[in-house]
């Protein structure tokens, strides 16, 4: 199944704040609420529907396919500890998400384009794989050409850039960043109940 490329407002109306999907979330949600009208009511979800909704939050926020999400679930199950938290770590430590969390792109989709087009380097090598798993001590930098630097500088100047999490360090003067560790659960801005996602897949696999 391919990634969603349809209207983002439709998704945020249904699932709520998805910081990785759109940087205009507050404005979009406000418009959505105005358009719904006072008479509209939400259908009460079943337990399955609630679990499905939480799964959809991950899928749309991180821009991954169903196949990729299932693969991350299977990997997370093989590691000692909370499967849900390991799942979030896999998603958060992806290169495209790391570029986004550093503020080098306004959305994860935008960060994925930077990676795909060869603008991002990891440890002095161009990496064009968005799913590349960033590791502690990895050093990210921008390809040394005007186009790459200008793209990133424009993104950094955007007021929508959120606070950089503690496991990442960005040096704006050199446009380099260091991965200092693994992301902490409290640093993840997405409102998600990862346990419900694990429960959803336990009934699917």
Swiss-Prot record:
Pfam families: Ribosomal_S4, S4. Residues 93-156 form the S4 RNA-binding domain. The keyword Plastid applies. One of its GO terms (cellular component) is small ribosomal subunit. GO terms for molecular function: rRNA binding; structural constituent of ribosome. It is found in: Plastid, Chloroplast. Signal peptide: none annotated. InterPro entries: Ribosomal_uS4 (IPR022801), Ribosomal_uS4_bac-type (IPR005709), Ribosomal_uS4_CS (IPR018079), Ribosomal_uS4_N (IPR001912), S4_RNA-bd (IPR002942), S4_RNA-bd_sf (IPR036986). HAMAP family: Ribosomal_uS4_B (MF_01306_B). Part of the 30S ribosomal subunit. Contacts protein S5. The interaction surface between S4 and S5 is involved in control of translational fidelity. One of the primary rRNA binding proteins, it binds directly to 16S rRNA where it nucleates assembly of the body of the 30S subunit. With S5 and S12 plays an important role in translational accuracy. Belongs to the universal ribosomal protein uS4 family. This is Small ribosomal subunit protein uS4c. It comes from Mesostigma viride.
């Amino acid at each position: 199944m391919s990634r969603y490329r349809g209207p983002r407002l439709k998704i945020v109306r249904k699932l709520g704040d998805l910081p990785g999907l759109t940087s205009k979330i507050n404005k979009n949600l406000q418009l959505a609420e105005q358009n719904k009208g006072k008479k509209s009511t939400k259908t009460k979800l079943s337990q399955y529907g609630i679990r499905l909704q939480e799964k959809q939050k991950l899928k749309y926020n991180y821009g991954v396919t169903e196949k990729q999400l299932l693969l991350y679930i299977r990997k997370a199950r093989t590691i000692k500890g909370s499967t849900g938290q390991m799942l979030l770590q896999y998603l958060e430590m992806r290169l495209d998400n790391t570029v986004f969390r550093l503020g080098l792109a306004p959305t994860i989709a935008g960060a994925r384009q930077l990676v795909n087009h060869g603008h991002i380097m990891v440890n002095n090598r161009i990496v064009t794989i968005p799913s590349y798993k960033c590791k502690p001590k990895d050093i990210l930098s921008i390809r040394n050409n005007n186009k790459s630097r200008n793209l990133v500088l424009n993104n950094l100047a955007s007021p929508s850039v959120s606070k950089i999490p503690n496991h990442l360090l960005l040096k704006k003067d050199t446009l380099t960043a260091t991965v200092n560790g693994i992301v902490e659960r409290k640093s993840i801005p997405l409102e998600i109940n990862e346990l419900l996602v694990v429960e959803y897949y336990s009934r699917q696999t």
